[in-house]
């Protein structure tokens, strides 16, 4: 997980026992600084995907929001080796997407932008033609709205033909770029308006439907992602919690949203046609629930207020059984957690 320290960002590494509990085994400097958006309370970067793992190439990518850079680590079991620190070609990077040798970083400030890279021999190579300014609205300095008026995540579609950007209140839209094998990234995205929804984070279900957390109504919505780049809503279910911002897939067809304002996790089960067939139980966490990651039958959730990681086992019903928690030094406000 990333602690996003303003004086120097770090990645904290844990060993996982067969029972799912965590033990801290190392801390690695990223070579860059963490950052904090104006108005952020428990989530410094107000994003999903600040730390991303490429399992195929054993590479870990981290944003350094305070120094406009990203770091590349080699993953060697439970050890990391810093390979690169390079520019994000924008202001305040918050999210990274990785797929099949392609990497995109999302910059949040100055209206937002994305920058693409290729991976060569474990190193990132910037692609000049893969930069796009998003042109989103910018919060008035001093308003305290920067953390909501910045984009939240960049993500690939499962087949790699689309690149999705959630814009939160900066655009109230889900923006979809097309990726052509020959011509690369489309010049402009298809902008899918979601008035008042504050689309924050996204993942895909096992059938390829787009799931989006909507922080405005505190809901999880499912969409069909069309070839044209448009999205068609299939379902939307309220969590009945506050500040539903992050979403993570669990075992089978289970999905879990983090509700920062309620310090809780809400479970869902998806159906074959993109219906969110049932809302499972809501489970309390430590204060300031933010990013989450799952591996096997376990789910790990960051608590941004105190710098905690809650440990859960996902039962056959989708319910969460608490295994305990750990307190990570200097991790309050940090975002970005992955398991491999």
At which residue positions do the language-model features occur?
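Beta-rich, blade/repeat-based domains predominating
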Residues: 32-53, 88-101, 134-160, 193-210, ...
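Blade-level signature of beta-propeller repeat domains, shared across WD40, Kelch, NHL, RCC1
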Residues: 304-340
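Conserved beta-strand positions in repeat-built beta-propeller and related beta-rich domains
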Residues: 2-5, 54-55, 62-66, 105-110, ...
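Beta-strand-rich domains and repeat architectures in extracellular enzymes and scaffolds
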Residues: 1-16, 29-57
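Short loop/turn segments immediately following beta-strands, especially the blade-tip
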Residues: 13-22, 73-78, 118-126, 176-185, ...
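Structural signal for beta-propeller blades
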Residues: 8-11, 68-70, 111-114, 171-174, ...
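Aromatic- and glycine-enriched pocket-lining scaffold segments that form the walls
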Residues: 104-184, 189-195
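Beta-propeller fold detector
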Residues: 23-32, 81-87, 125-139, 186-193, ...
């Amino acid at each position: 997980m990333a602690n996003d320290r303003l004086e120097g960002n770090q990645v904290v590494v844990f060993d996982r026992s067969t029972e799912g509990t965590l033990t801290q085994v190392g801390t690695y400097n990223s070579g860059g600084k963490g950052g904090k958006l104006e108005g952020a309370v428990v989530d410094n970067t107000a994003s999903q995907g600040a730390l991303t793992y490429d399992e195929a190439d054993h590479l870990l990518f981290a944003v350094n929001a305070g120094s406009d850079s990203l770091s590349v680590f080699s993953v060697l079991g439970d050890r990391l080796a810093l390979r690169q620190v390079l520019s994000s070609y924008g202001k305040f990077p918050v999210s990274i997407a990785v797929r099949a040798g392609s990497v995109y970083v999302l910059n949040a400030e100055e209206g937002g932008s994305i920058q693409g890279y290729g991976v060569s021999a474990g190193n990132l190579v910037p692609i000049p033609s893969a930069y796009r300014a998003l042109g989103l609205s910018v919060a008035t300095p001093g308003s305290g709205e920067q953390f909501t008026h910045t984009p939240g995540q960049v993500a690939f579609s499962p087949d790699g033909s689309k690149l999705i950007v959630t814009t939160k209140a900066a655009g109230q839209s889900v923006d979809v770029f097309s990726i052509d094998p020959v011509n690369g990234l489309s010049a402009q995205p298809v902008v899918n308006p979601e008035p008042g929804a504050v689309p924050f984070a996204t993942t895909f279900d096992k059938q390829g439907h787009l799931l989006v957390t909507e922080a405005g109504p505190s809901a999880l919505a499912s969409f069909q992602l069309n070839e044209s780049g448009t999205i068609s809503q299939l379902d939307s279910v309220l969590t009945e919690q506050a500040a539903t911002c992050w979403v993570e897939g669990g075992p089978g067809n289970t999905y879990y949203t983090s509700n920062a304002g309620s310090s809780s996790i809400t479970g869902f089960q998806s159906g074959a046609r993109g219906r969110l067939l049932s809302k499972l139980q809501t489970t309390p966490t430590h204060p300031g629930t933010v990013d989450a990651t799952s591996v096997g039958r376990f789910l790990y959730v960051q608590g941004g207020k105190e710098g905690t990681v809650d440990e859960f086992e996902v039962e056959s019903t989708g319910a969460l059984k608490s295994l305990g928690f750990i307190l990570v030094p200097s991790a309050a406000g940090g975002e970005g957690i992955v398991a491999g």
